[in-house]
A protein has these predicted regions:
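C-terminal cap/substrate-recognition subdomain and adjoining C-terminal extension
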Residues: 66-218
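Alpha-helical substrate-recognition element adjacent to the catalytic core
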Residues: 1-101, 195-198, 212, 218
Length: 218
């Protein structure tokens, strides 16, 4: 998952607008605050629950390595976790390295090569609020686009945010049908979308002169 603004948003000072029922983490050193997207606590509990196969989470941010580790630590402290719920924590360093070797931004192939057999094109997807990270060829059948969690944006409605409810529903479908998903077929191939009955998330977008078919909660 991306951090800003997918699961959390960083603010140098406390947000003066509506934050009722939002989990937050305040940095005692500089007074900055991380606000967590509605439903994140419940999704964490779901992901680490008694689910077979297990749901593995990861962080991938455009921030630097220090920031990504800070967010990981903040999540552990805020939600009283004895150990990190994240299988990996990536930052802009991994993005730059991938671009140098001809990969795309937030390229899921990095994850699959780092954890061979554990993460595959049949069981892995990137959740991102930046459509360009899902439109490209490496992620278009292994990505899920969501609305930005942006408290500063007047168009964002805190009370209508169902992103984590959608993700939980999607993950349940994947887990339920995982035995029927071929190892050599991308998770969100058209056949898999039909098999898992998740067509309501299947969207068509025009990107330049191309029509892109991707999964999205928007």
């Amino acid at each position: 998952m991306l951090i800003d603004e997918t699961i959390a948003q960083y603010h140098k000072t406390p947000w003066k607008g509506e934050t009722t029922n939002l989990d937050s983490y305040r940095n005692s050193d500089d007074g900055s605050v991380l606000y967590f997207r509605p439903g994140f606590r419940q999704f964490l509990e779901f992901a680490k629950g008694p689910i077979e196969p297990n749901i593995a989470l990861g962080i991938w941010t455009y921030g630097n390595a220090a920031y990504s580790k800070y967010v990981e630590r903040a999540i552990c402290e805020k939600f009283n976790l004895d150990k990190s719920p994240f299988r990996f924590v990536y930052s802009v360093d991994e993005i730059r390295e991938d671009l140098r070797r001809g990969y795309e931004e937030k390229d899921v192939r990095r994850i699959m090569k780092t954890f061979p057999g554990e993460f595959t094109e049949a069981n892995t997807f990137l959740v991102d609020n930046r459509p360009a990270n899902v439109h490209h060829r490496a992620n278009c059948q292994n990505g899920f686009v969501i609305e930005s969690f942006d408290l500063r944006n007047p168009r964002y409605n805190l009370n209508n945010d169902r992103v984590f409810a959608d993700l939980q529903s999607l993950c349940k479908r994947i887990v339920k049908n995982h035995h029927q998903l071929p190892n050599n077929r991308p998770l969100f191939s058209k056949k898999n979308i039909k098999l898992m009955c998740v067509g309501k998330y299947h969207r068509k977008y025009k990107v330049g002169n191309e029509i892109k078919e991707i999964m999205s909660s928007e």
